[in-house]
């Protein structure tokens, strides 16, 4: 009779998690690949408008203005209210996820806050001529850059990663 030996018991080598691993370096300038890698990234980066090398917030606001011009003839007040409300809720999630994945609490490349807030501004001033909308654009960008009063408070108070930070990204533009 031939005896079959059981294979020797080999302990499985499992790599222990590194507790104090440094976080990955922050993603200072997102790429198109990053924007397309997750739906939240695409939304938070304003369908790619936030990928601009210079003044991504301004480019995102211009994209919002263009989308407003396209959508405005097709939406009534209830439609705009729903779009802005849903855009805010989805944006909260998208900005939270994207900020965490980028490793930057409020990257200038995250422009969904400009998009939804500028839609609100344009909706509130409608009907408005092109020149009135241009003034609204200029004032919106000025107040976004300067951040005085309630905008400064929101910007200081709601920082960090997680839902609170995602909410803060949106709130300073609504203020």
Predicted regions and their residues:
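Short Lys/Arg-rich amphipathic alpha-helical segments
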Residues: 52-53, 58-72, 79-80, 87, ...
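Hydrophobic core segments of alpha-helical transmembrane domains in multi-pass membrane proteins
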Residues: 81-88, 132-143
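Interhelical loop and helix-boundary elements at the membrane-water interface
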Residues: 11-61, 93-122, 141-175
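Extreme N-terminal basic, low-complexity initiation segments
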Residues: 2-10
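Membrane interface segments of multi-pass transport proteins and intramembrane proteases
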Residues: 70-85, 153-165
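Extended, non-catalytic scaffold segments that flank or surround catalytic motifs
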Residues: 47-48, 68, 137-138
């Amino acid at each position: 009779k031939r005896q079959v030996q059981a294979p020797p018991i080999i302990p499985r080598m499992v790599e222990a998690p590194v507790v104090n691993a440094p976080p990955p370096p922050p993603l200072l300038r997102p790429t198109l690949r990053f924007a397309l890698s997750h739906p939240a990234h695409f939304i938070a980066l304003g369908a790619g408008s936030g990928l601009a090398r210079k003044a991504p917030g301004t480019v995102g606001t211009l994209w919002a203005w263009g989308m407003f011009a396209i959508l405005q003839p097709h939406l009534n007040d209830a439609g705009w209210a729903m779009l802005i409300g849903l855009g805010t809720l989805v944006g909260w999630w998208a900005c939270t996820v994207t900020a965490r994945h980028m490793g930057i609490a409020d990257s200038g490349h995250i422009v969904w806050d400009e998009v939804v807030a500028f839609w609100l501004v344009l909706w509130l001033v409608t009907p408005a001529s092109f020149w009135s909308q241009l003034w609204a654009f200029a004032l919106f960008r000025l107040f976004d850059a300067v951040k005085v009063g309630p905008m400064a408070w929101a910007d200081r108070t709601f920082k960090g990663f997680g839902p609170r930070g995602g909410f803060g990204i949106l709130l300073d533009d609504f203020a």
